[in-house]
Amino acid sequence: LWNLQFGSSRIVPKKRASGAPIDGVVVSAGIPELDEAVELIKNLQADGLPYVSFKPGTVDQIRQVVRIAKAVAPTTIMIQVEGGEAGGHHSWEALDDLLAATYAEVRACDNLVLVAGGGIGTPERAADYISGQWAHAYGLPDMPVDGVLIGTAAMTAKEAHTSPEVKQLLVKTPGIPADAKSDDVFAPQAAHWVPSGKSVGGMSSGLSHLHADIYELENDSAECGRLLVRVMKHPEELDSRRKEIIEALNKTAKPYFGDLASMTYLEWAQRFAELAFPWVDPTYADRFQHLLQRIEARVNDTDSGEFTSKLFTADGVSAEKAAAAGLLTHDDILADPAPALEKLALAYPQTAELKVVPADVAWFPVLVREYPKPMPFVPVIDNDLLRWWGQDQLWQSEDQRYSADSVRAIPGPISVAGITTIDEPIADILGRFEAAM
């Protein structure tokens, strides 16, 4: 995605140049090498993006950012120190430990703005970090930060795209109180973790398709994730637990497509439309049209060479001419797949009887991977199951078609306890944080 956003495609700089209100970039999932980071900061600022932040999650990564800050001085950059209580992908590092171990080094750089996050879900907790009083618990003097990261607390804001049902679940989720006592004798003093593969307070700690630790709401989706992780670690169980896997997948927003070899060609097309429409991405419609073209090529009477489609016009034909000929355009597919399914059944009635042949069964995963945007279903039960299911899973929590129990939502286990309102304006939420400071 980096190449898509900032590399060869440069989507973000182009959007910024055209007037999009994007002023900053956060570099996460690792810290670039020194030379690369220096060049990156230079290029981003030249593109009109003045605020460049790095998000370290370990002591070594924090020190890497300090070296970067020294190399680009006096240019100001931000360091977002995130502890292991943050939502979504997380480390097992305590925020307080990270800050205490590196505070002097960070503060020695006048051009480094220190922001802390991960488990800061209430105004009172944020105030402790802004004032520096968080350090008193360790017998240390005030160690104030310049800002705090607010993530989970904004998930139910009026402006948040989170679906109403998921917002309700977030309010109902107790989470882990910030003053809770941990039973983990190895946990740092201030850490409140959900053990890997377990659930506490309505929160679960699982693995994403990247095989990285992830905090998420405990629901059918999280339960399915645990099963898939188990099978990933024990691939010999894939066949024996196939029925259980399919049942678990079908309770989530990303169900199993179905046993393609047992479907007819018409059922194949109908199932695709059922799971993918309304199209949340235009490439879903592209792949649906390619599927119909594959089916037509399979069932058409012509043995070889070209044939005249009974479904679609050639590219470039106007909508008026297409309608006059009784054929469909790509715009018709974008609007609604139903007419195409009806036309397929009428033009090729044999599609309701013919079973999908093995060559087309094998081709289907190729179609699914045709574009970068993953499809909203699992096309095949194989050893890549966790990736098929886990990719591109977060948008469903913003789509009212899907129940809160079926989607992956990723608040922090501490901060979720501080969510008490639904559809409160974000200005009011941030205002409460500001007032506490």
Predicted regions and their residues:
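Active-site entrance/lid segments in N-terminal catalytic domains of soluble metabolic enzymes
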Residues: L1-C109, D315, A325-M437
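A residue-identity detector for tryptophan
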Residues: W2, W92, W134, W193, ...
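Glycine-rich phosphate/ribose-binding loops and adjacent secondary-structure elements
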Residues: V25, P32-L34, K42-A212
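Extended charged low-complexity segments that act as oligomerization/scaffolding linkers
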Residues: E33, D110, E159-V317, K321-L334, ...
